[in-house]
Amino acid sequence: MSEEIKKGLLGIVVDETTISHVVPELSALTYRGYTVQELCDKCDFEEVAYLVLNGELPNKNQLKKFIKQERSERKLSKQILNDIKKMPKNAHPMDVIRTCVSLMALEDKDTKDNSPKANMRKAMRIFAKTPTAVAAYFRSRKGKSIISPSKNLSFSENFFKMMFNKVPDKEIVRAFDISLILYAEHSFNVSTFTARTITSSLSDLHGAITGAIASLKGPLHGGANEAVMLSLIHI
């Protein structure tokens, strides 16, 4: 028997996921059994977020409740906003997001509760507050005043408002909504693996998301998109 140690995880099935699947032979990506093409044609981003988190598309009442909850969790504390203002202006935005999620953990009343219900509450808070953190840093590093989130705008509309102090035409908002749907899930990738490795030690959800964001930053994962954008800007 060979004593050679095979390093890495190539060809090793670590676990399975029921959330998202890449189907190369069909050039398709599915979320909970729905193709992204179908979801982009028929759904808003909030509906897809509900689908990913809950396993099924919402009815009208479920969607209304989900949207109300998300909008109620958008605000960041004064402490976190002050911390964002103190962050270096040349910091990488992914490092800022990662740090903000860690700061959220320090304030979240459910941080030490790893029950499914508590994790769902924490997931909603992270989901709602992350765009606020992104926009706050974007404006702070440019020397502009931070714009508070609105409870009267959709997820995408609110992000534009916090970033640029205006909501663009519906076509642009819809295009951004579709981009969020396309980036919502991508099967059992390296950031998902990282998050699940962290939670396997019974660590908290914020820690898992922090690790996943650090992984996503890498040039062999989400960082590849950044490299493409920088190349396009250069060209």
Annotated model-derived regions:
Residues 1-233:
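Hydrophobic alpha-helical bundle cores within soluble ligand-binding/oligomerization subdomains
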